[in-house]
Design a protein with these regions (language model features):
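Claisen-condensing/thiolase-fold acyl-transfer catalytic domains that form or cleave C-C bonds
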Residues: 81, 85, 92, 103-183
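Short, surface-exposed connector motifs at secondary-structure boundaries
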Residues: 96-101
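Short amphipathic alpha-helical segments, especially helix-boundary/capping motifs
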Residues: 60-67, 90-94, 122-126
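Condensing-enzyme catalytic core mediating Claisen C-C bond formation in acyl metabolism
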Residues: 5-78, 82, 86, 169, ...
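A structural signal for alpha-helix termini and helix-coil/disorder junctions
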Residues: 51-54, 94, 155
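Short, well-ordered secondary-structure micro-motifs
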Residues: 2-3, 43-45, 117-118, 177
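Short amphipathic alpha-helical surface micro-motifs
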Residues: 1-4, 27-28, 59, 87-89, ...
Length: 183
């Protein structure tokens, strides 16, 4: 899906898959989800041409053009750093906790500059462990949060009972944040 010549996407994105398995627990461990979308910026991350355009082009002249990802990285960066801190605070409030109660911060692994800006904006104590596996895995889109948390668990940095704030965002521009307790 990446255009190999597009320096804004080709070297950032990686392949990955992740999932969270939930089961019964004696105490609630998954906080409320804060989610939404900012449709005013829908065109900052797009796949083009879209499938309707491909269908119409193929019907008209028989040519098939494979769609590729296009991203306005600076716009996404500015939107993420100006919007996601507020979304994180909403998730903390919905869970009834503060930044001081959090042990782990697991943001979408878009890039380290966004993560740095979010950490500064949330004013976490120094003890909060911040997932930064983008340097090893790249931006694996929706898989980045499960993979980053798995890395923290495997490295012994995430402990049972820790509270983790997770926040993700992507095309649309859609977003979600939630506080979870590590089992």
């Amino acid at each position: 899906m990446d255009e190999p010549e597009d320096r804004g996407t080709a070297f950032i994105f990686a392949d990955g898959a992740g999932a969270f398995l939930l089961g019964p627990a004696n105490e609630p461990g998954v906080g409320p989800t804060v989610w939404g979308a900012d449709g005013s910026e829908f065109n900052t991350i797009v796949v083009a041409p879209n499938w309707l355009e491909i269908r119409d082009t193929c019907a008209a002249d028989g040519e098939f053009v494979w769609p590729t990802l296009h991203m306005e990285g600076q716009k996404v960066f500015k939107w993420a750093v100006s919007s996601m801190v507020g979304v994180c605070y909403q998730a903390l409030e919905a869970a009834g906790v503060t930044p001081d109660d959090i042990q782990l911060f697991v943001p979408h692994q878009a890039n380290n500059r966004i993560t740095d800006a979010l950490v500064r904006g949330l004013k976490f104590p120094e003890s909060v462990i911040v997932a930064r596996d983008i340097v090893m895995t790249g931006n694996t889109s929706a898989a980045s949060i499960p993979l980053a948390l798995d890395g923290l668990v495997n490295d012994g940095l995430a402990k049972s009972g820790d509270l983790a704030l997770m926040v993700g965002f992507g095309a649309g521009l859609a977003y979600a944040a939630q506080v979870v307790r590590i089992p």
